Amino acid sequence: RGGVEQGFYSDMKSDEDWMFGRGWFGRYYEPAIMDYRSDIETGYLALVLRGGLFYLVPYVAILILSFFNGYFRSRNLFCKSFAILCLMQVVNLYPYGWPAFNFYHFVVWVGVWVCNSKKFRRLDNIQIAEYCF
């Protein structure tokens, strides 16, 4: 994967590429295969390719804020579990973890909602069980 990342870094030369990315269908030149690629295996670089730092930074900030709210400001295991899932998504951005339209990422964004909702954070474990189940 190191060669793929090096190809990405060498092709993303301008500040505009890093700030705004190359769009949803953006591509970068990969010297190892002598062709342009539209995806990269590393999650945070995939976000940079699509929308630049203006896409990556808010994405990570929302997930980290959700982790802190859900883990440290909640009174129940429901929020704490979603908070850990949000943190795992941030950690997972390095080895792979780029956003996709699938059930896992749907659950992550439900977790963002739950962790940032005072309504859920104020409930204790018994109230969560009554409310959800």
Map each language-model feature to its residues:
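Long extracytoplasmic/lumenal interhelical loops at the membrane interface
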Residues: 1-51
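Transmembrane alpha-helices of multi-pass inner-membrane enzymes
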Residues: 85-90, 99-133
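Alpha-helix boundary/capping detector
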Residues: 34-35, 73-75, 117
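Hydrophobic transmembrane alpha-helices and their immediate junctions
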Residues: 50-90, 124
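N-terminal low-complexity, intrinsically disordered patches enriched in charged
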Residues: 30-32, 61, 106
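Alpha-helix termini
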Residues: 34-36, 65, 110
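Membrane-interface micro-motifs in multi-pass membrane enzymes
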Residues: 40-43, 48-55, 95-105
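Hydrophobic, Leu/Ile/Phe/Ala-enriched alpha-helical segments that form helix-helix packing faces
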Residues: 8-12, 70-71, 110-112
